[in-house]
Amino acid sequence: MDVDPRSYEQVAIKDNEIHNIVLSYLVHNCYKETVESFVACTGMKQPADCLEDMEKRKRIFHYALEGNALKAIELTEELAHGLLENNKDLHFNLLSLHFIELVCTRKCSTEALEFAQSKLTPFGKVQKYVEKLEDFMALLAYEEPEKSPMFHLLSLDYRQQVVDSLNRAILAHANRPSYAAIERLIQQTTVVRQCLSQDHNKDGLPPFSLKDFLKS
């Protein structure tokens, strides 16, 4: 049988545990000003080098999201030297953001093609990049690439996915948690509840819904 939400109230959670979870989320997402206010209000100890690290990561993400992926790559190498050399997937994705910017801003197709040939094509020696390369190169065939079958590559969602991966990689490179504590808690809760639902499926219980669980 499912767990009665009222039973949650029987589990005591210390304030400092909640504070640590909130702080983890704020630091992970580079909310510098909010971190300063939160630390001041709660009396928590600020993590070492926390503010400087957030400021540097925030600059990198800003450049990547605003269309200056080459600057983001440069700053990433300064902050986490060797990261992109060892993480080819991430390096490819960042380079692809610059290519997309050339396409989106209607730069001369020759410039976009030359960039692709010099920076992206070498990845084609590895099979897993071939299909991605074909998708990116196909954008050049359309006068309005946003109407092409690969339009999703031009979206802010794609940029955000790359930035999220970059954030996790930079944090891991610095031996820091690559996921915010709240994200890990939600992942764990979802997996556990899905397993419970499967075990009790014979009782006709509905599949676990995270959205419904958070409303309970």
How would you label these PLM feature ranges?
Residues 1-48, 53-83:
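Short, charge-rich, low-complexity alpha-helical interaction segments
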Residues 56-59, 63, 67-70, 75-216:
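Extended acidic/polar alpha-helical scaffold segments
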